[in-house]
């Protein structure tokens, strides 16, 4: 109920603050949002690999990276991990991972991350390997070093408040300049599956801040698109690069939202008679699945309504598979067979139509997005050089 109320408030705020001005391409704010979903992150990883390949082709630049084109990249849970991988700099100040490196990452590390701990009372997985590999990959990099604005969510169980890690908020909240590996583990620490994460940050004046964090989906549901849009709104208002934008209109937003798949209509459904026999643990697992699916649907519905109301429906693309079945519905099945199935899901999704009313496939829509992103980047660079 509280989540729905928050959505409605943000929805009407968006409608109230938009205007009818036409957006210039170079003034558009570009946003990438990536859902949570555990090992199902393989699905958006396939989409990201295709999009980055298209950007490299359009710009004739094999070194082009997603972070070069998006003003804001946001993610929750496994989406937060993907966000960090494509925005964390290497020694050459370029993203340490190309999009094509993400699927191999899941295949190499997924079976070790989702290795049952054997605990009956504690979480299903101890999280030690996950934290170790995040430390190895992300090193000592902190939020302020990200190559573009990020929006990664978590929830503090001690203060009972959401925690949103962004670059643009560091001036007001320097304690949020945490290490990326701490942030990534925290946003992925789904209750039941992984232990909560405790860490401490220190500001330049010596102040000490303590965090006790769990999965970002607790704070922002599995689809962080609304969060990413709100961060983009603030960025457009505060960043000098967008000084020409006097009043933000959602016609000036270009949003790509990537899902990790939901169950088909006839899979994972239950009857009242069946559910009446469930115990607390079975209910907790089912409620998490139901809540994530419902919240993802409602987020897409709200955002679609806003963009349509502003006659900007082509500025929003939601890429989601709505017919997962069998093992592909599980967020923690990291068997090689299931990961291969998830790769197939992502590749097949590219060939599917965006909607029943449009013959355009996701592949074609992403090519269109790539062209827009490329053109905007060139216009922005040309404007900056004069």
Swiss-Prot record:
Changing residue 257 to C/T: Loss of hydrolase activity. A motif (DGA/G) lies at residues 215-217. The keyword Translocase does not apply. Residues 32-229 form the PNPLA domain. One of its GO terms (molecular function) is monoacylglycerol lipase activity. Residues 1-23 form the signal peptide. Belongs to the patatin family. Lipolytic acyl hydrolase (LAH), an activity which is thought to be involved in the response of tubers to pathogens. Can use p-nitrophenyl esters as substrates with highest activity on p-nitrophenyl caprate (C10). Also active on mono-acylglycolphosphocholines and diacylphospholipids, with highest specific activities observed were obtained with the synthetic phospholipids diC8PCho and diC9PCho. Mono-olein and myverol can also be hydrolyzed. This is Patatin-B2. It comes from Solanum tuberosum.
């Amino acid at each position: 109920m509280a989540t729905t109320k928050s959505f409605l408030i943000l929805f009407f705020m968006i409608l109230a603050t938009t205007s009818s001005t036409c957006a210039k391409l170079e003034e558009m704010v570009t946003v990438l949002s990536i859902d949570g979903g555990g090992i199902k992150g393989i699905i958006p990883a396939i989409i990201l690999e295709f999009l980055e390949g298209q950007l490299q082709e359009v710009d004739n630049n094999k070194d082009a990276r997603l972070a070069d084109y998006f003003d804001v990249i946001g993610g929750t849970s496994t989406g937060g991990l993907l966000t960090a991988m494509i925005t964390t700099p290497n020694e050459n100040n370029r993203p340490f991972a190309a999009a094509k490196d993400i699927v191999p990452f899941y295949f190499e590390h997924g079976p070790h991350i989702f290795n049952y701990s054997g605990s009956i009372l504690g979480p299903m997985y101890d999280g030690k390997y996950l934290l170790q590999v995040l430390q190895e990959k992300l090193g000592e990099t902190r939020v302020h070093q990200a190559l573009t604005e990020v929006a990664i969510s978590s929830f503090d169980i001690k203060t009972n408040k959401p925690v949103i890690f962004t670059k643009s908020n560091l001036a007001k909240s320097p304690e949020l300049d945490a290490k990326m590996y701490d942030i990534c583990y925290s946003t992925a620490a789904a209750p039941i599956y992984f232990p909560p994460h405790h860490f401490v940050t220190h500001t330049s004046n010596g102040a000490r801040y303590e965090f006790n964090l769990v999965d970002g989906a607790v704070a922002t549901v599995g689809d962080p698109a609304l969060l990413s849009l709100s961060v983009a709104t603030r960025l457009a208002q505060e960043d000098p690069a967008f000084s020409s934008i006097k009043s933000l209109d959602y016609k000036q937003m270009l949003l790509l939202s990537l899902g990790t798949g939901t169950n088909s209509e006839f899979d994972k459904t239950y009857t009242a008679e069946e559910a009446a026999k469930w115990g607390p643990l079975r209910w907790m697992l089912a409620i998490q699945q139901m809540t994530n699916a419902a919240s993802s649907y409602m987020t897409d519905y709200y955002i679609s309504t806003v963009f349509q109301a502003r006659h900007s429906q082509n500025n929003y693309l939601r890429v989601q598979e709505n017919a997962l079945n069998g093992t592909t519905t599980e967020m923690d099945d990291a068997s090689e067979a299931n990961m291969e199935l998830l790769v197939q899901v992502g590749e097949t999704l590219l060939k599917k139509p965006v909607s029943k009313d449009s013959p355009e496939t996701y592949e074609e829509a992403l090519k269109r997005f790539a062209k827009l992103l490329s053109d905007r980047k060139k216009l922005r660079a040309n404007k900056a050089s004069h």
